[in-house]
């Protein structure tokens, strides 16, 4: 083996090793609040896009670029859910809606703007999960509550404040509850919500 070839191998190993530096896994603790969400949504008769930011992530600090002004313009963690409506059931004043889809959490590049949903996906995806949702809408006052379950299918190492992290592990699950209000028909956004997610089910400590 030539000296040049040996140098190339050492360089390649160094690059590989640096790329495999361990990241701290931010767990999704069972029966504890892992995330808090603030968001809006736009619906069609067959689809729903929900978007916003994470206002609290257990295990992470400084998730806003400005700790005094904590909103969509300074949020470093954002999310977008794209879902299809599978079923609608009417029971008196209640409309029960079932949806499935995908939720992506992003390491965001602020600012985001609720007037432009695409600004909540302008960062780097760091967690992807399958999503199922039940909405219970009170058509009398246009308020609703939801419960949905996310099953994490992909996580990507990211750097925040100079440290490497992974947001959970593949196989983690969390249950989310939202409370919200629907806007008048034809107006944008279709509505507003806030809520939190709690870890459900424990998995082995593996990446």
Question: Where do the language-model regions lie?
Answer:
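Bacterial N-terminal signal peptides
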Residues: 7-18
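Extracytosolic secretory-pathway proteins
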Residues: 24-207
């Amino acid at each position: 083996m030539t000296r040049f070839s040996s140098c190339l191998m050492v360089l390649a190993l160094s690059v590989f090793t640096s790329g495999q530096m361990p990241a701290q896994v931010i767990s999704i603790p069972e029966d504890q609040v892992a995330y808090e969400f603030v968001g809006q949504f736009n619906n069609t008769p067959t689809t729903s896009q929900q978007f916003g930011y994470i206002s609290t992530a257990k295990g992470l600090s400084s998730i806003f670029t400005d700790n005094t002004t904590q909103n969509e313009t300074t949020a470093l963690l954002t999310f977008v859910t794209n879902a299809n409506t599978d079923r609608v059931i009417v029971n008196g004043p209640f409309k029960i809606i079932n949806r499935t889809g995908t939720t992506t959490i992003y390491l965001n590049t602020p600012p985001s703007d609720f007037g432009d949903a695409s600004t909540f996906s302008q960062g780097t995806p760091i967690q992807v999960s399958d999503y199922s949702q039940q909405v219970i809408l009170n058509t009398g006052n246009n308020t609703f509550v939801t419960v949905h379950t996310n099953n994490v299918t992909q996580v990507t190492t990211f750097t925040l404040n100079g440290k490497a992290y992974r947001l959970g592990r593949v196989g983690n699950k969390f249950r989310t509850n939202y409370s919200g209000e629907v806007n008048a028909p034809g107006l944008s956004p279709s509505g507003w919500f806030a809520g939190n997610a709690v870890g459900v089910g424990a998995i082995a400590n593996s990446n």
